[in-house]
Regions:
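Boundary/entry segment of secreted carbohydrate-active catalytic domains
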Residues: 1-15
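Hydrophobic faces of well-ordered beta-strands that scaffold small-molecule active sites
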Residues: 3-7, 30-32, 62-67, 92-94, ...
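Active-site-proximal loop/turn and secondary-structure-junction residues that shape catalytic pockets
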Residues: 9-11, 34-36, 68-71, 96-100, ...
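Active-site acidic/histidine proton-transfer and metal-coordination neighborhood
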Residues: 16-19, 54-61, 70-162, 169
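Acidic/histidine-rich catalytic cores of soluble enzymes
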Residues: 19, 121-221, 228, 272-274
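Structural motif
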Residues: 25, 86-87, 185, 234
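Glycine-rich, proline-tolerant flexible connector loops at the mouths of alpha/beta enzymes
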Residues: 31-52, 101-104
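C-terminal helical cap(s) of enzyme catalytic domains, especially alpha/beta-barrels
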Residues: 252-273
Length: 275
């Protein structure tokens, strides 16, 4: 397993800071966010080369990138995919097919399947693999929902990215064992974060409201000790991408990220020793 750091937490920071922090903390590499306002804009894929080179100076690989891409016609997708491949980025997360109640699930699924077919053809031509992340507010928030999208797709071209933290704090909640079971042929990435729910105030109706928040990996509702044990016992050799979405001052985010990485590495070591 490779453990990489998702670069969303570095909004506004130079790429030199990304490399310095990730290498000092001990990450294997980077999950590069390709999004307007971040280090690479999807309309300017030529910037990828310089970013990958700079991170390499800190001893970091860039095995994967995260995009918002769902419609292959929205940008020059072949150019973007080919640039990823040329720079050794072989795993690319797609964007979100959002659930819109007024449209309805069936037409949304039909559109997503059509776009996925086009994306799969482009990915195969470029020699990269795509990943669909489980995420709230989408038609792929749970394992069961994602499986409906993935049926018929070659896992070497399109895979899936379970994210137990999203499933806990957002929607798509289901037994994590079921998630990993139903998606097993396609899993190439696992999102690593944790969170929980807390009682809030009552609505006028008297109904109790609840709110969620991100928590350290050892402190939330996701049983990472069990999940890591499962990944080790099944010889998972994909990517673990660690997300630090904490809404605290930047130095504190880095401190918590250090704790999270050390925790996940300890779980891997202990699970391996027990095999």
């Amino acid at each position: 397993m490779q453990i990489v750091l998702f670069t969303k937490l570095f909004l506004g920071q130079p790429i030199e800071e990304v490399g310095a922090v990730a290498s000092t903390l001990g990450f294997d590499g980077i999950d590069l966010l390709v999004r307007p306002g971040f280090h690479v804009d999807p309309s300017q894929p030529e910037a990828i080369t310089a970013v990958v080179h700079r991170l390499g100076e800190d001893g970091l690989r860039v095995p994967m990138a995260t995009t918002d891409l769902t419609d292959p016609a929205a940008i020059d997708t072949p150019r973007l995919f080919n640039t990823f491949a040329e720079n050794g980025i072989r795993l690319v997360r797609l964007g979100y097919w959002k659930y819109i109640q007024s449209v309805g699930y069936a037409p949304l699924l039909e559109t997503a399947r059509r776009q996925l077919e086009e994306l799969a053809s482009l990915a195969e031509a470029a020699g990269i693999t795509l990943a669909i992340q489980l995420h709230g507010g989408t038609i792929h928030g749970s394992g069961a929902q994602a499986a409906a999208l993935l049926q018929g797709h070659d896992p070497r071209v399109i895979g899936v990215y379970p994210d137990p933290g999203n499933q806990t704090v957002q929607d798509g909640r289901e037994d994590w064992r079921f998630t990993f079971d139903i998606l097993e042929p396609w899993i190439n990435t696992v999102g690593v974060k944790n969170g929980g729910w807390f009682p809030s105030t009552n609505a006028v109706s008297g109904q109790r409201r609840w709110h969620s928040d991100w928590l350290g990996l050892a402190d939330g509702m996701v049983p990472w000790d069990d999940i890591v044990g499962h990944l080790v016992s099944t010889d998972f050799d994909g990517v673990l991408t660690l997300h630090s979405h904490y809404e605290v001052p930047y130095p504190q985010v880095i401190d918590q990220t250090r704790l999270d990485l050390n925790y996940i590495r300890r779980l891997i070591a202990e699970s391996g020793a027990s095999q």
